[in-house]
From Swiss-Prot:
Source organism (scientific name): Laribacter hongkongensis (strain HLHK9)
GO BP, one annotated term: lipid A biosynthetic process
Family note: Belongs to the LpxC family.
Entry's Gene Ontology cellular component terms: membrane
Matching NCBIfam families: lpxC
Domain of life: Bacteria
Record Pfam families: LpxC (PF03331)
Stated name of the protein: UDP-3-O-acyl-N-acetylglucosamine deacetylase
Catalytic activity: a UDP-3-O-[(3R)-3-hydroxyacyl]-N-acetyl-alpha-D-glucosamine + H2O = a UDP-3-O-[(3R)-3-hydroxyacyl]-alpha-D-glucosamine + acetate
Keywords from the named record: Hydrolase, Lipid A biosynthesis, Lipid biosynthesis, Lipid metabolism, Metal-binding, Zinc
Cofactor(s) annotated in UniProt: Zn(2+)
Gene: lpxC
Length: 304
């Protein structure tokens, strides 16, 4: 059968919070089968477990943030969640000493490294997938996102920025993960922001830890990072990285085609809520034999 996965051993890293600017210690620990992804704020007097779920995403200002009914926050989780999706990890305890995960270099690659360093093991329980059975969509003005039935996992995403740096690169990417490696083609794409946004973010109490070391920074004309871009279309690739992380908040891999135009964290979360609200639009599935699994999931890296 296709098994659930967790880590072989705990692993710890430290970094800066993108929005808080706090120094954060992050520890990833193995979890039993059917646990899901559980966050723990170890800086609080009572470190309650927060199970990752779409219903708890209650702040989407520039990131995806879980907020419990009693106000405990766990923010900027999308890059870590994207890495977990890319490695097929189902069960994990995520301990953190602040209200957001560290930004690392602005991509998912450092999290991939951490997880692979810890090692990944299969567990004696079937991995559960969510298969989309009917189209589900969310639209707002000219922005939209959609999930459609598809025997695998594919992403088609387009962004639209009227800016010289963006006009030099493709702003649309179509990826079928049956033929594309998440680690090679998506994980290294970094978050990005504009210089003119810094003042606005500061008024919102956000972006205090941002720098050229953990984001692509763009002025009125150019990318300011000395080494430039990692991919010609790194901007839209990072949006795909974000979307994969946002979608994995549902707790299971999606067997579906995801597409979007000018979408972001808020719309991605609305899409998951719309899906879950329509029981006829989805089903849980498991697989007893690897040959029955859609080929998109054959590219998930072998166990470390």
């Amino acid at each position: 059968m296709i098994h659930q996965r967790t880590l072989k051993a705990p692993v710890t890293a430290s970094g800066v919070g993108l929005h808080s600017g706090d120094r954060i210690r992050l520890t990833l620990r193995p979890a039993p089968p059917d646990t899901g992804i559980v966050f723990r704020r170890t800086d609080l007097p009572e470190a309650a477990d927060i199970l990752c779920s779409p219903e708890l995403v209650n702040d989407t200002r520039l990131s995806s943030t879980l907020v419990t009914p009693d106000g405990v926050r766990v923010g900027t989780i999308e890059h870590l969640m994207s890495a977990l999706a890319g490695l097929g990890i189902d069960n994990l305890y995520v301990e953190m000493t602040a209200q957001e995960t560290p930004i690392m270099d602005g991509s998912a690659a450092p999290f991939i490294y951490l997880l692979q360093t810890a090692g990944i093991v299969e567990q004696p329980a079937k991995k559960r997938f969510i298969r989309v059975l009917e189209p589900v969509g969310v639209a707002e003005g000219d922005k939209w996102v959609r999930l459609e039935p598809y025997d695998g996992f594919q992403v088609s995403l387009e962004i639209s920025f009227d800016h010289p740096a963006f006009r030099l690169a493709p702003q649309k990417v179509d990826i079928d993960f049956a033929r594309t490696s998440y680690i090679d083609e998506i994980a290294r794409a970094r978050t990005f922001g504009f210089m003119y946004e810094v003042e606005t973010m500061a008024r919102m109490g956000l972006g205090r830890g941002g720098s050229l070391d953990n984001a692509i920074v763009i002025d009125d004309e150019f990318v300011l990072n000395r080494d430039g871009l990692r991919f010609p279309d790194e901007f839209v690739r990072h949006k795909i990285l974000d979307a994969i992380g946002d979608l994995y908040i549902i707790g299971h891999p999606l067997i579906a085609a995801f597409s979007g135009y000018k979408s972001g964290h808020a719309m991605n979360n609305q899409l998951l809520r719309q899906l879950l609200a329509r029981p006829s639009a989805w089903e849980y599935v498991t697989f007893s034999h690897s040959e029955d699994v859609p080929s998109s999931f054959h590219r998930i890296p072998h166990l470390a």
